[in-house]
């Protein structure tokens, strides 16, 4: 269902799954599973679940829709004929393939969906990530020069976590593949570290055992990031030797952040200059920090 792949134990009676529980003996998840996975049995047994292709028998303008079950062979033949007609009339890019989230986690469905796109000749491929996380691959390609690298923060060794916009208690931190997200936050605090959430509201994830919230005006995160970089540079916390080995255009970055001092971004972010300097200092002084 989602990429943490929390292990579940299924109870089976008379060949039917009757209950799903967390795998409490799993060494990674340690018995964690969110309600999405635990309640998936309701999806599996839902009487309205579609288990066979359905062909609409009345016009789309008529509501409600009326459907008739057809065989898989009939469905494939009909869909294939229609797709070929579209491609012949309008070219291959008139067809696009959309990957839903579960497809990417299915070892059979993913290569078949990719093959469908390749056989159609279309260059248009979309997924749940297109509308949900397209900014991340774009940033990764800009920073690392490839789309094939997706770094994930090493929370297990972090002493400081600066979390922009994340709500791990609610979202379970998609794209980080974390089990037990709140326990991970508590572990950081438990070893003397600190978690600071940057969010427009006081989120459910923040409490005395996980971390604190610094309220920010919506859509102003980039200005806060620029001001933090400004302070890190001003206080000599750029590791220029490491940057020289792994990066480039440091002068360009410095020219960009020079105009965004904490005082300059206070109005647009709603965060006072001293708090911004404190965040930069916390991040810079931490033995190991993550964003």
Question: What is each model feature region?
Answer:
Residues 1-235, 264, 272:
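N-terminal export/assembly segments and adjacent metallocofactor-ligating motifs
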Residues 90-94, 238-243, 290:
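Flexible, glycine/charged-enriched surface loops at secondary-structure junctions
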Residues 45-50, 230-260:
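Scaffold signal of the M16-like zinc-metallopeptidase fold and its non-catalytic homologs
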Residues 104, 216, 241-245, 253, ...:
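A general boundary/transition motif marking the beginning of the first structured unit of a protein
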Residues 228, 246-291:
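Active-site phosphate/pyrophosphate-binding segments
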């Amino acid at each position: 269902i989602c990429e943490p792949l929390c292990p579940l134990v299924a109870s089976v009676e008379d060949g039917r799954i009757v209950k799903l529980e967390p795998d409490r003996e799993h060494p990674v998840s340690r018995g964690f599973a969110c309600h999405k996975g635990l309640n998936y049995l309701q999806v599996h047994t839902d009487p309205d679940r579609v288990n066979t292709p359905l062909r609409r028998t009345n016009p789309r303008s008529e509501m409600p829709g009326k459907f008739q079950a057809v065989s898989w062979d009939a469905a494939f033949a009909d869909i294939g004929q229609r797709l070929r007609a579209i491609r012949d009339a309008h070219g291959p890019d008139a067809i696009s393939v959309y990957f839903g989230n579960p497809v990417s986690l299915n070892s059979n469905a993913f290569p078949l969906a990719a093959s469908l796109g390749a056989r159609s000749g279309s260059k248009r491929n979309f997924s749940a990530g297109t509308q949900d996380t397209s900014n991340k691959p774009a940033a990764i390609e800009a920073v690392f020069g490839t789309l094939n690298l997706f770094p994930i923060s090493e929370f297990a060794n972090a002493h400081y976590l600066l979390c922009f916009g994340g709500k791990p208690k609610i979202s379970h931190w998609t794209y980080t593949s974390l089990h037990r997200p709140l326990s991970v936050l508590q572990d950081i605090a438990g070893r003397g570290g600190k978690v600071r959430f940057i969010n427009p509201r006081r989120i459910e994830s923040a409490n005395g055992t996980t971390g604190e919230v610094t309220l920010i005006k919506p859509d102003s995160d980039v200005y806060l990031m620029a001001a933090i970089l400004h302070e890190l540079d001003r206080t000599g916390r750029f590791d220029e030797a490491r940057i020289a080995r792994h990066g480039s255009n440091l002068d360009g970055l410095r020219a960009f952040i020079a105009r965004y001092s904490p005082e300059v971004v206070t109005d647009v972010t709603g965060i006072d200059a001293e708090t911004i300097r404190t965040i930069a200092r916390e991040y810079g002084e931490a033995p190991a920090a993550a964003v």
